UniProtKB/Swiss-Prot annotation:
<keyword id="KW-0560">Oxidoreductase</keyword>
<feature type="active site" description="Proton donor">
    <location>
        <position position="148"/>
    </location>
</feature>
<keyword id="KW-0521">NADP</keyword>
<feature type="active site" description="Proton acceptor">
    <location>
        <position position="162"/>
    </location>
</feature>
<feature type="active site" description="Proton donor">
    <location>
        <position position="147"/>
    </location>
</feature>
<feature type="active site" description="Lowers pKa of active site Tyr">
    <location>
        <position position="166"/>
    </location>
</feature>
<feature type="binding site">
    <location>
        <position position="166"/>
    </location>
    <ligand>
        <name>NADP(+)</name>
    </ligand>
</feature>
<dbReference type="InterPro" id="IPR020904">
    <property type="entry name" value="Sc_DH/Rdtase_CS"/>
</dbReference>
<dbReference type="Pfam" id="PF13561">
    <property type="entry name" value="adh_short_C2"/>
</dbReference>
<feature type="binding site">
    <location>
        <position position="98"/>
    </location>
    <ligand>
        <name>NADP(+)</name>
    </ligand>
</feature>
<feature type="binding site">
    <location>
        <position position="197"/>
    </location>
    <ligand>
        <name>NADP(+)</name>
    </ligand>
</feature>
<feature type="binding site">
    <location>
        <position position="45"/>
    </location>
    <ligand>
        <name>NADP(+)</name>
    </ligand>
</feature>
<dbReference type="InterPro" id="IPR036291">
    <property type="entry name" value="NAD(P)-bd_dom_sf"/>
</dbReference>
<comment type="similarity">
    <text>Belongs to the short-chain dehydrogenases/reductases (SDR) family.</text>
</comment>
<feature type="binding site">
    <location>
        <position position="162"/>
    </location>
    <ligand>
        <name>NADP(+)</name>
    </ligand>
</feature>
<feature type="binding site">
    <location>
        <position position="25"/>
    </location>
    <ligand>
        <name>NADP(+)</name>
    </ligand>
</feature>
<dbReference type="InterPro" id="IPR002347">
    <property type="entry name" value="SDR_fam"/>
</dbReference>
Length: 267
């Protein structure tokens, strides 16, 4: 967990765009980058108030932020998001593609609509966010995509749609890392396990042996923490701190990697 000591503003002068930053993991990432001095574009799709609350929280750190509403499943909206970000701050150094959705559904019940909804956000949108980042980032920039531990897990029923959508992102990561190298842009993906967010609250019981709908959250947390040597589950700040390292110049030799963020959990 985070300490209360002062954090060096090691990202001062950098500008970071984070998709899905109005809540959950994206919010945690936005706050951690801002604490280190980065100016932040808080992208969101629907809820204005939570996004503005993130902007206000960032202001308390002494960093600058704006919220930009854009549906990143639509390529013209991705283009507009980047143009508005550039118009406001003048340049971009860091792009974190965080937006996503999770689904558990028996394979025989998955519809075309289910498939398109999950892959449009988890996969297609991440490709075009990464594409725009590659085009618009300054030399030496950072692209950080969002995979999941689920991409490489076995034994989780009814999870093919989500797992497949994240596995594709890992392929994007390795390929973009090659293509972006001439601009000295690094491209990595993080693959978290369970992180305490609203998505966790809705879905984490699926990962607990013997889990069932309506299971008390305390039991879910205890069940998942039992797999972790650190004896807890993750919070968004844990993910944000790793992203802050990947965004820092010191991380340059980390490139084309998929970084598991599980606290050492046995999966």
């Amino acid at each position: 967990m985070a300490s209360t000591e002062e954090i060096p503003r090691s990202l001062a002068g950098k500008v970071a765009l984070i998709t899905g930053a109005g809540r959950g993991i994206g919010k945690g990432i936005a706050i951690e980058l801002a604490k280190r001095g980065a100016s932040v574009i808080v992208n969101y799709n629907s809820a204005d108030k939570p996004a503005q609350e993130v902007v206000d929280e960032i202001a308390k750190t002494g960093s600058r932020a704006i919220a930009i509403k854009a549906d990143i499943t639509k390529v013209p909206e991705v283009s507009r998001l980047f143009q508005e970000a550039l118009q406001h701050f003048g340049h971009l150094d860091i792009v974190v593609s965080n937006s996503g959705t999770e689904v558990f559904k028996p394979e025989e019940e998955v519809t075309e609509e289910d498939y398109d909804r999950v892959f449009n956000l988890n996969t297609r949108a991440q490709f075009f966010v990464a594409q725009h980042a590659y085009i618009h980032l300054r030399n030496g920039g950072r692209i950080i995509l969002m995979s999941s531990v689920a991409a490489n897990m076995s034994g989780i029923p009814n999870h093919a749609l989500y797992a497949g959508s994240k596995a594709a992102v890992e392929g994007f990561t390795r390929s973009f890392a090659v293509d972006a190298g001439h601009k000295k842009i690094t491209v990595n993906a993080i693959a978290p396990g369970g992180v305490k967010t609203d998505m966790y609250d809705a879905n984490a019981w699926h990962y607990v042996p013997g889990g069932k709908p309506g299971m008390p959250m305390e039991e879910i947390d205890k069940g998942l923490a039992a797999f972790c040597p650190l004896e807890r589950v993750a919070v968004p700040q844990d993910i944000g701190r790793v992203v802050a390292f990947l965004a820092h110049p010191d991380s340059e030799w980390v490139n084309g990697q998929i970084i598991l963020l599980t606290g050492g959990s046995i999966t």
